Swiss-Prot record:
Transaldolase is important for the balance of metabolites in the pentose-phosphate pathway. It is an enzyme of class 2 (transferase). It comes from the Bacteria. The keyword Repeat does not apply. GO terms for cellular component: cytoplasm. PANTHER family: TRANSALDOLASE. Keywords: Cytoplasm, Pentose shunt, Schiff base, Transferase. It is found in: Cytoplasm. This is Probable transaldolase. It comes from Desulforudis audaxviator (strain MP104C). Pathway: Carbohydrate degradation; pentose phosphate pathway; D-glyceraldehyde 3-phosphate and beta-D-fructose 6-phosphate from D-ribose 5-phosphate and D-xylulose 5-phosphate (non-oxidative stage): step 2/3. NCBIfam families: fsa_talC_mipB. Its EC number is 2.2.1.2. CDD domains: Transaldolase_FSA (cd00956).
Length: 215
């Protein structure tokens, strides 16, 4: 399973990229608005930090307008993937973009049925929102499992991105469910890297070495 970073903060992306563990980035209008910077400039800067897919979302809700936005965004860099909301107009847009060679990531997916429709329309990626489903009393990871099973059964090329990740256990569950990718916030990536016993063990090694040096 691959890891993407779910952020529009270039400092976080730069630090995560230096670890050598992320292979892409996902953004959305809320994340970019939080940065208070020009949308196009942020996306362009991100593509210079990671050598992999960078998802940038359209704002329009009508197919033709989504396609126009997608064509403009795709000119920023070949790695830009267009995030399209899982609505009927979004499916139309995906089916129009796929023959043009513009990759899409269908977002706001909350059921395996939605994921299947997105894949049949030609989506490159689908993003089931695990955390939001859990918040609503559903089993978000079950949607990931069902989607992966369906895509595998029918050999659909669409890749599954486990999204709306809230904690490291979500990442572990996504990996066990067969998700191709989990897109994680920066703080979750940091939590994945840490463990109290690692810190205790390192301190002991260093203390033992320091005592040896004093002899």
């Amino acid at each position: 399973m691959e890891l993407f970073l779910d952020t529009a903060n270039v400092d976080e992306i730069r630090e995560a990229a230096a670890l050598g563990v992320i292979s892409g980035v996902t953004t959305n209008p809320s994340l970019i608005a939080r940065e208070g910077r020009d949308f196009t400039q942020v996306v362009r800067e991100i593509t210079g930090l990671v050598d992999g897919p960078v998802s940038a979302e359209v704002i329009s809700t009508e197919a033709e307008a989504m396609v126009a936005e997608a064509e403009e965004l795709s000119q920023i860099h070949p790695n830009v993937v267009i995030k399209i909301p899982m609505i009927l107009e979004g499916l139309k847009a995906v089916s129009m973009l796929e023959p043009r060679g513009i990759r899409t990531n269908v977002t706001l997916v909350f059921s395996a049925n939605q994921a299947l429709l997105a894949a049949l329309a030609g989506a490159s990626f689908v993003s089931p929102f695990v955390g939001r489903l859990d918040d609503a009393g559903h089993d978000g990871m079950e949607v990931v499992r069902d989607t992966v099973d369906i895509f595998d059964l029918y050999e659909l090329p669409t890749r599954v991105i486990a999204a709306s990740i809230r904690h490291p256990l979500h990442v572990l569950a996504a990996a066990k469910a067969g998700a191709h990718i989990a897109t994680v916030p920066y703080q979750v990536l940091m939590q994945m890297a840490g463990h109290p016993l690692t810190d205790v063990g390192l301190r002991k090694f260093l203390d033992d070495w320091a005592r040896l040096k004093k002899r």
